[in-house]
Design a protein with these regions (language model features):
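DNA strand-break repair and replication-stress modules
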Residues: 1-115
Length: 115
């Protein structure tokens, strides 16, 4: 699936699972703010309800294997940030500013614009 197809898929399956440790965010909990802005929810496990698996550094291989067995789209953390404009184009972004953090502090990320 390309990013546009994944965005369409997330309109029906709004649960996302993150495995591993984010390199671009302070922690996996920072994904919660981002998911909220797109009407998505974090899954507690990989299941048939999961719409997307985001793979960060040092992921759990069994989560990747489970997602693959269930034909769940699997993308990297970098691809997630490339997917965000596709979600916005489908009207999934609620207009809420999305805070995200790195080791230098908290920044504002404006979807579709310059942060």
């Amino acid at each position: 699936m390309d990013l546009k197809e994944i965005a369409l898929h997330l309109q029906d399956f709004r649960n996302v699972y993150v495995t591993g440790n984010p390199a671009m965010l302070r922690s996996r909990t920072d994904f919660l703010d981002i998911f909220s802005a797109y009407g998505l929810a974090a899954d507690m496990s990989v299941s048939k309800r999961t719409g997307l698996l985001i793979v960060c550094s040092d992921p759990m291989q069994k989560k990747i294997d489970r997602a693959a067995a269930l034909n769940i789209p699997i993308i990297s953390e970098q691809q997630w940030f490339e997917l965000m404009p596709e979600l916005e184009a489908l009207g999934m972004w609620n207009g809420k500013p999305i805070p995200f953090a790195d080791d230098n502090g908290i920044y504002r990320f404006d979807v579709g614009g310059v942060g």
